[in-house]
Amino acid sequence: MSDANTPAPSSAAITSGVTSEQSLVDWLQTMPEVDPSSPSRLPGWSVGHVMTHIARNADGVLSMFSGLHQYPHGLDGRNADIEAGASRGWSELVDDVVSRSRAVAAAIAGRADWTGTVHMLPGERPTAQVPLLRQREVEVHRVDLGFGDEFADMPADYVRRDLRLMEMLWTSRKPMGMTTLPDAALALDPPTRLAWLMGRVEVPGLDPAGLF
């Protein structure tokens, strides 16, 4: 995918992503201990799975910034790393997420060159999209952990930016001429519309978005 039409992330977008990382760190460090084997909101994944994924995704961003593939050992290696880490104790999981979140926040905040592309698991993506995609991982998986956060609690500026990207993705997968979301989707408030596009909520009268 070319990055010709992907502008560099704004300073406000960078700050928003870094703030999401710090908010995640603060949230986890003040939370009472949780049983990592407890089910998350993601089918088949425990809290330990989601926590490990958040940390390994941060490692993936750092890997891409070094010119390597997001997950050098591919999908199977990514899944194996998540399985291997999911059974760790709560404090070890928190320490892992905290250290990786701080590292990726510093890397994003300190990066000056947003040109070119990176090697993500699905394929090439513009480097300039990485801050938003990482912020998505942080914000959406906070909800997936099942500790009480909802899409309505997400930063409004993040929701606005990711809605734009997700709506473009939805449109790109429809036949020519179907260029807008269904009226029932457009009637939803932005956080709920984003949750529907990401397959996190069912909406009466709407088929699943089918993007993930």
Task: Tell what function each PLM region has.
Residues 18, 22, 48, 55, ...:
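A structural signal for well-ordered alpha-helical segments within the folded catalytic domains
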Residues 1-42, 49-52:
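Basic, Lys/Arg-rich alpha-helical nucleic-acid-recognition elements, primarily the DNA-binding modules
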